[in-house]
A protein has these predicted regions:
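C-terminal outer-membrane beta-barrel translocator/porin domains of Gram-negative envelope proteins
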Residues: 1, 50, 92-193
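Transmembrane beta-strand segments of outer-membrane beta-barrel domains in Gram-negative
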Residues: 1-120
Length: 194
């Protein structure tokens, strides 16, 4: 559940604030199979691994998006953003609070992203997106929702989080990394094979 409110104090600067809440349970959890697997894995890190059966999180969130040189028009009293020839810079901060609404997760996440779609002519576009993220505080979180590992390559916009795919990560750890880098480049053209 994401509850966000946004405001645009000046042209091109969007500030979004809200909370993100997740309730997740491990499907088909079998204590014996998991224990046997960990025993067979032997010593080292996997021997001491504690996998939770529930991930409940409550996280206040702040997102700042800035697009310099944003063009817009007014539709009555409503401002309609059209686009810009400059890239959009995004800074996203989230902090999970343990004990609020039954959350058992405490984390802190910071992400930075730059994205732009460049019109080459009337029907061709070149888009790019580059960013990185870091968990500055982790409590067995391991990127459980795969949010940062999918490609969103939708012609309507880069911000469509429904489309795309995600890459499967190592089956033992999901992703225990504290940071990630990502980059996408897309060239869109009709009749590209003709």
């Amino acid at each position: 559940l994401d509850v966000l409110h946004n405001i645009e104090p000046v042209n091109g600067l969007m500030i979004k604030a809200g909370v993100s809440m997740h309730w997740r349970k491990l499907a088909n959890y079998d204590h014996l199979r998991l224990r046997d697997f960990l025993q067979q894995a032997g010593g080292g890190i996997l021997h001491n691994l504690s996998i939770r059966t529930e991930y409940n999180s409550f996280a206040p969130r702040l997102r700042v998006e800035w697009t310099p040189g944003m063009y817009y028009y007014m539709n009555g009293r409503r401002k309609m953003n059209v686009g810009s020839s400059m890239p959009t810079f995004i800074l996203d901060y989230e902090r999970g609070l343990k004990g609020v609404f039954g959350s058992n997760d405490e984390h802190e996440r910071v992400e930075f992203d730059v994205q732009q779609k460049i019109k080459l002519n009337r029907i061709r576009t070149l888009g790019y997106r580059a960013g990185f993220g870091i968990f500055t505080k982790m409590d067995n979180v391991y990127f459980v929702d795969f949010a940062n590992f999918k490609r969103s390559n939708i012609p309507e916009g880069w911000n469509d989080e429904i489309g795309g795919t995600f890459q499967l990560l190592d089956r033992h750890w999901y992703n225990s990394s504290r940071r990630y880098w990502r980059g996408h480049v897309a060239y869109e053209s009709p009749f590209i094979l003709l």
